[in-house]
């Protein structure tokens, strides 16, 4: 029974080492992060944001 326990522990250590080497290691998981809302005003906010970034030709509308 003792040999089986040691064998299971060694297997667990080897598998965890393999996962750390092949995985991201200590890098943060950016792929799982929620996307940032650059346009909180919805479609209208997005349109106005595009106008502001491109140098709006319609000054009264670009607030």
UniProtKB/Swiss-Prot annotation:
Pfam families according to UniProt: Conotoxin
Residues with PTM D-tryptophan: 58
Residue numbers covered by the propeptide annotation in the UniProt entry: 24-54
GO molecular function: ion channel inhibitor activity; toxin activity
Signal peptide as annotated in the record: 1-23
InterPro entries for this protein: Conotoxin, Contryphan_CS
4-hydroxyproline sites (modified residues): 57
Example of a GO cellular component annotation carried by this entry: extracellular region
Modified residues (Cysteine amide): 62
Other notes: Exists in two forms, due to cis-trans isomerization at 56-Cys-hydroxyPro-57.
Protein name: Contryphan-P
Organism: Conus purpurascens (Purple cone)
């Amino acid at each position: 029974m003792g040999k089986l326990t040691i064998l299971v522990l060694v297997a667990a250590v080897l598998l965890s080492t393999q996962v750390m080497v092949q995985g991201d290691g200590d890098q943060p998981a950016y792929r799982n992060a929620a996307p940032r809302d650059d346009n909180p005003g919805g479609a209208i906010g997005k349109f106005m944001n595009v106008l502001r970034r491109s140098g709006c030709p319609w000054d009264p509308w670009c607030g």
